[in-house]
Amino acid sequence: MERPESELIRQSWRVVSRSPLEHGTVLFARLFALEPSLLPLFQYNGRQFSSPEDCLSSPEFLDHIRKVMLVIDAAVTNVEDLSSLEEYLTSLGRKHRAVGVRLSSFSTVGESLLYMLEKCLGPDFTPATRTAWSRLYGAVVQAMSRGWDGE
């Protein structure tokens, strides 16, 4: 990724990473609003959540949010050399495939990520920042998609 884009990503992430659980919750609330069919994929100890609010307040799901935000943090840290995360992201893709996530759902996750960034950053979420994050997310999904391909 080009240096100016990397800097936009790092700069914006510094703001988000001050409250990762809060912003991660915004991301997943948006995800469930856009694609409610994903809610049943999140079950802990056999417990099916009755609503997005029920899911978003469960300690197990909050732990999942923390993990997702750590993956984003790793991508930001390695934004100029995502190949260092290739094996990990492919493995993460396999895990998501195994629990029934469709590869097509990652488009909605991307929309939700951009929504969260916009809500968090306000006017600092410029078109250039949006483009930079879209490119980073696309590269992450490309690596994760290898987990569906079996590569």
UniProtKB/Swiss-Prot annotation:
Pfam families per UniProt: Globin (PF00042)
User: Which residues does the annotation say bind heme b?
Assistant: H64, H96
Could you provide one GO biological process annotation from this protein's UniProt record? cellular response to hypoxia
The conditions that induce or repress this protein are given as: Up-regulated upon oxygen-glucose deprivation.
Post-translational events? Phosphorylated during hypoxia by ERK1/ERK2. Phosphorylation regulates the heme pocket hexacoordination preventing the association of His-64 with the heme metal center. Thereby, promotes the access of dioxygen and nitrite to the heme and stimulates the nitrite reductase activity. Phosphorylation during hypoxia is stabilized by 14-3-3 proteins.
Q: What is its main location?
A: cytoplasm
Recorded consequence of changing H64L: Improved binding of dioxygen and carbon monoxide to the iron atom
**Per the database record, which ranges form the Globin domain?**
1-149
For this protein, what is the EC number?
1.7.-.-
Top-level taxon of origin = Eukaryota
Reaction catalyzed? Fe(III)-heme b-[protein] + nitric oxide + H2O = Fe(II)-heme b-[protein] + nitrite + 2 H(+)
User: What keywords does the record list, in alphabetical order?
Assistant: Cytoplasm, Disulfide bond, Heme, Iron, Metal-binding, Mitochondrion, Oxidoreductase, Phosphoprotein
- Molecular functions (GO terms): GDP-dissociation inhibitor activity; heme binding; metal ion binding; nitrite reductase activity; oxygen binding; oxygen carrier activity
Q: What class of enzyme is it?
A: oxidoreductase
User: Where does this protein reside within or beyond the cell?
Assistant: Cytoplasm, Cytosol; Mitochondrion matrix
Where is it expressed, tissue-wise? Answer: Predominantly expressed in brain.
Give the record's GO CC terms.
cytosol; mitochondrial matrix
Subunit text:
Monomer. Homodimer and homotetramer; disulfide-linked. Mainly monomeric but also detected as part of homodimers and homotetramers. Interacts with 14-3-3 proteins; regulates the phosphorylation of NGB. Could interact (ferrous form) with G-alpha(i) proteins (GTP-bound form).
State the similarity comment: Belongs to the globin family.
Q: What does this protein do?
A: Monomeric globin with a bis-histidyl six-coordinate heme-iron atom through which it can bind dioxygen, carbon monoxide and nitric oxide. Could help transport oxygen and increase its availability to the metabolically active neuronal tissues, though its low quantity in tissues as well as its high affinity for dioxygen, which may limit its oxygen-releasing ability, argue against it. The ferrous/deoxygenated form exhibits a nitrite reductase activity and it could produce nitric oxide which in turn inhibits cellular respiration in response to hypoxia.
The protein depicted here goes by the name: Neuroglobin
Q: Where is the organism placed in the taxonomic lineage, from the top?
A: Eukaryota, Metazoa, Chordata, Craniata, Vertebrata
